[in-house]
């Protein structure tokens, strides 16, 4: 990027750690065939925290570099719906909101995943999943020259592997 003839090269590193737990409100069969393990749906309430760390470097070529970092912890609550479509295939829809002025003023997350269970170390103890996720922050701290503002929405594909112990 060039502004007023000055070449600027930005670099942003973002680290995110989400930890939490869930409470299963219930699981319901989606099939009315007695004695059969058919499709089911489970609904969970979730709660936890989302830690965010950002490191920003602005290299003004020929002039110098500005850099800084910021980190904060957001409390989050949400809901998750898990559709067990077959013994191996599943669909998960989840979302959360948080911040509440503790870390961010507001943060949210929404995602959808398709999963496939398989045998890794035991019976159906692993799940390969892929889908799409969006994550947003509205974070502000400081004033004047010391003001830091992070109002960002990130979204894109997600791939992962989960292992159950």
Predicted ranges, named:
Residues 16, 25-27, 49-55, 97-101, ...:
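Transmembrane beta-strands of outer-membrane beta-barrel pores
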Residues 1-16, 53-70, 100-103, 137-156:
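Extracellular/periplasm-exposed beta-strand and loop segments of Gram-negative cell-envelope proteins
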Residues 45-51, 81, 93-97, 112, ...:
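Transmembrane beta-barrel strands of outer-membrane/channel proteins
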Residues 26-42, 85-89, 119-126:
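Short loop/turn motifs that connect adjacent beta-strands in outer-membrane beta-barrel proteins
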Residues 90-105:
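Transmembrane beta-strand segments that form the barrel wall of outer-membrane beta-barrel proteins
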Residues 14-20, 42, 72-76, 105-111, ...:
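Transmembrane beta-barrel architecture of outer-membrane proteins
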Residues 19-23, 47-49, 77-83, 112-116, ...:
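Residues on the lipid-exposed face of transmembrane beta-strands in outer-membrane beta-barrel proteins
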Residues 110-165:
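Predominantly the C-terminal beta-signal and adjacent terminal strand-loop region
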């Amino acid at each position: 990027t060039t502004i007023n003839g000055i070449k600027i090269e930005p670099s942003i590193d973002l680290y995110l750690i989400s930890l939490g737990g869930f409470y299963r409100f219930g699981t319901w069969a989606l099939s009315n065939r007695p004695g059969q393990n058919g499709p089911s749906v489970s609904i969970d309430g979730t709660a936890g925290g989302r830690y965010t760390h950002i490191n920003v470097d602005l290299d003004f070529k020929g002039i110098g570099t500005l850099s800084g970092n910021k980190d904060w912890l957001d409390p989050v609550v949400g809901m998750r719906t898990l559709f067990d479509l077959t013994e191996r295939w599943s669909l998960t829809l989840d979302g959360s909101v948080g911040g509440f002025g503790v870390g961010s003023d507001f943060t949210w997350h929404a995602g959808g995943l398709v999963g496939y269970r398989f045998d890794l170390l035991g019976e159906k103890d692993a799940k390969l999943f892929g889908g799409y996720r969006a994550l947003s922050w509205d974070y502000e701290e400081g004033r004047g020259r010391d003001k830091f503002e992070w109002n960002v929405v990130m979204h894109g594909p997600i791939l992962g592997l989960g292992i159950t112990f």
